[in-house]
């Protein structure tokens, strides 16, 4: 689960917001994970794919302003200091970085007000030991905490053998995305780390969803969905295993062997690797018309895959 760090700076003195209402002395902001089962409106802010506000793609012409808002969302719950913000936006900050940042924050407030009057007031200026900027937002107004909660819920169901419940939770998780994360963001070290982490988390969620779908017997159109994700991440071995398994479970030996051959050629030509053992095992199952073995192979990977993904969660809104 994503946990929001508190706003207290390392020296113990609390920053205070400068805006419509100053934060009280000693004020801290803690994020509580949203209840995954309540009926809530769509998140106000979205970063899972294209940056969006109220479900609409954010019409911010300046890529730096989009980066400012994205950084504040990823670090929701505490301000970002001026010096750190400069390092986030530029690997080699210009001399005018502070002035540029101030100008972009002012412009971003106007952009937010155009989407929703008064929304720009959420962008706060902080004074004191942690002089900087931050976005006042509750975790249930933001799509990333919802995604993290749904993925964790789905993995728990998957590990417990409740495959249909796992499918439902993981469908909810992947449904929050509208494309890969990181579009139009500056290619700085900070953003590149978050881009890699979040996009891997998205692919992990799809992989778990496809695994749960196979085990739940929900395989209609599943091969098509797996193919679309393989097109994005062609070197994920488990996706190829799942695709071969779906065809094998449908009794389509020709399609199963075609998948195996495509995988073998790709791994050999691009990576210099032999056919992975899991794919070879699926080929044998198809040749033997052994659907039970194909299902057993998928089930045997469930624990291993889920436990691996437990250690590779979306990056915390910090660092």
PLM regions with names:
Residues 58-89, 108, 238-241:
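Short amphipathic alpha-helical recognition elements used for nucleic-acid or partner binding
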Residues 25, 31-37, 71, 82, ...:
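Extreme N-terminal targeting and regulatory segments of eukaryotic proteins
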Residues 47, 79, 141:
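Short aromatic/basic micro-patch
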Residues 1-66, 124-132, 314-319:
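Short boundary/linker motifs that mark transitions into or out of structured domains
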Residues 34-45, 105-138, 268-275:
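DNA-binding patch around the recognition helix
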Residues 87, 103, 110, 258, ...:
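DNA-binding alpha-helical recognition surfaces that contact promoter or target DNA
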Residues 74, 94-98, 125, 131-319:
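Intrinsically disordered, charged and Pro/Gly-enriched terminal/linker segments
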Residues 61-70, 94-116:
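DNA-recognition element of transcription regulators
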